[in-house]
């Protein structure tokens, strides 16, 4: 089975459908994304925009999900393509990782101490704090 993501005019994933392998293959049985795209367009309209995604292969960084963005020309190592699916950017200061298809904070998340871990503490990103002072951003939260 093959999976294809439909993109809107902003390259945001609106749905993902499953397509039979035979609907992505030529007469010789060779699978091709373009054949799968044509099949999807025959089902849901010639003007629709489709990109193949995969659970099993690292072909585009992440398996596409509704709301994710398809980005082209992203220089990420360890990803089989420079065209990747990424979640929505969580904060304005975060950038795409150069090693994986995911967003990274501009500051490394601090490591929790053993005591903090035992207390169930965790760090959250505070964009306002970072914008006010770009040497801060991670806030330690401890449940009561």
Regions from the PLM with identified roles:
Residues 1-144:
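Interaction-interface detector
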